[in-house]
Amino acid sequence: MSQAAGVEDVPPFDRSFLTSGCTFTRIGSGPLGGKASGLLTISRGLARLFHPEAFPSFAVDVPRLTVLGADAFGVFLRENGLFDVALSGAPDQVIADAFQRGSLPAHLVGDLRALTEEMRRPLAVRSSSLLEDARDLPLAGVYLTKMLPNNQPDADARFRRLSEAVKLVYASTYFRAARAYRAAAGAGDDEERMAVIFQEVVGRRHGDRFYPHVSGVARSWAWYRTGRTRPEDGVAQLALGLGKQIVDGGLSWVFSPARPKARPPFASARASLKETQTEFWAVNMGRPPAHDPTRETEYLVRAGLPEAEFDGTLGRIASTYDAASDRLLPGIAREGPRVLDFAPILVHDSLPLNGLVRALLLACEGCLGGPVEIEFALTFEPGGGVRFALLQSRLMAVSQQLVEVGEDPPPGWKALVTSRDAMGNGSTEGIADVVWVERRGWEMRRSAEAAAAIAALNRRLVSEGRPYVLIGFGRWGSADPWLGIPVAWGDIAGARAIVEASPPERGIEVSQGSHFFHNLAGFRVGYLSVPAGREGDVDWGWLEARAGAESIGPVRHARLEQPLLVEVDGRSGRGMILRREETT
């Protein structure tokens, strides 16, 4: 099925669909959008390519969902006179407020109201645009998803919250990050239309929190990977709670499906206390927060590992740190700090999760016709069963260009950046702009200031059609400003090589944001990491000597007379950003 498949291929929404046995229904007309089309293809193809009897420990499914066809998007804009503000370049909040004042098409209200009357579990209201999840134009993570508790006693209140969420997803089509992304990709705003997915949130309720025991992302091919693995080995990430922890670039457990028991890249077991997940996301099922329909996280809460242990959700996925031996002991039977390393599952084989993930990656490749990325959630059911829900599957862009990066630069070139932990694959030339965070006096508390300056420079360089190299400290795209610079993808969409240097004050593991790396792959962006102790692998002196460099807060921008060359060898993990030798 094509990415632009119509909703006519899906049965119409039945107002008793919870008991109808139908798992995929539609409201309205028009295309499904990329995300929904991919899910429909997978849900139909798994019956042919996946053999669940090989994994009797699991109940595998694609969660029940309903799609609001993309035609409603155009009707909503037209009937409410929103085209002018949508295309005005106004701030996100102005656009969001204008969309909230609009009314959804009257002919769809009955089905949407019935959806909230029938469905009393938490709902995810997700984007599914025409351009989203395309192999060559992946808008992963650019548009918004809103989670709703959907537990208000009043059906009218549930319907109002659903309507607000739809309008927020619609508005995000024209937010700054989305516009910048499309501009960098050469796609016009008039090419985009938005369908919307309503999907049950997978998880279980624990007091006022609703969340899955495990969320995960896995990729069958990994130019963007970690550890001593081959690209074809793929890579996977696991986290406690909602998958937002992973896709926002938060700390998660990263491993190769080919080597799930490999030792983590930490200097010691004690180091894992700082480099593994300590907080998780959940849907707030308790007292409603202050009403704010334009905030994506309005109904989400964050909690720590003590709360998870109280909920009883750590026992099968965590280990305990033993200070006396500097070791991690599987499980939580002993006293001590908890570490989310998923060792009971991955190392001690209490559940064949890794085998299931590998089988599903293979099946999804067969369905979609190439390397894939999947998102999933797992819950341990009260009766002893385990539910594995496949939430998303998308094609990945994979470069097969052959590049060899040696120890030394080729003749006539000098190394601006050298990395032994580079991600991506390929060669990019003709980059005549470089944007970097100044090293002297840098402190991570200035991350938000740096992010704003970089976003401003990115907008200008994208509008001028000038790709650039971006160099900074910590994890690009991290939601935690103490771990990295909190940019969204649209803030850096014009970069064609990104360098992640360890902050002067402490080392930080390489960034792992799922949607972030999907976009890197789609744009063929090289991602070069320079760890602590290898500060000399960035020629800071040459950067600081650029006469006439523009300054915006802690960020510098220089336009070069001689373009840079970026080379990344995906198989060896080596990369270089090269500058021409200067003649005197």
Where are these predicted regions, by residue range?
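Extended, well-ordered alpha-helical scaffold/bundle regions in very large, multi-domain proteins
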Residues: 64-69, 73-97
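Polybasic, proline/glycine-rich intrinsically disordered low-complexity segments
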Residues: 503-545
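Residue-level detector of short coil/turn "hinge" positions at structural boundaries
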Residues: 60-62, 84, 371-372
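An N-terminal structural lobe/cap that precedes and organizes the functional/catalytic core
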Residues: 52-62, 66
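Conserved mixed alpha/beta core segments that line enzyme active sites in large multi-domain catalysts
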Residues: 10-54, 103-502, 522, 549-550, ...
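Metal-assisted phosphate- and nucleotidyl-transfer catalytic regions
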Residues: 93-107
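An acidic intrinsically disordered interaction segment
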Residues: 1-13
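A polyampholytic, Gly/Pro-enriched intrinsically disordered region
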Residues: 83-89, 375, 517-522
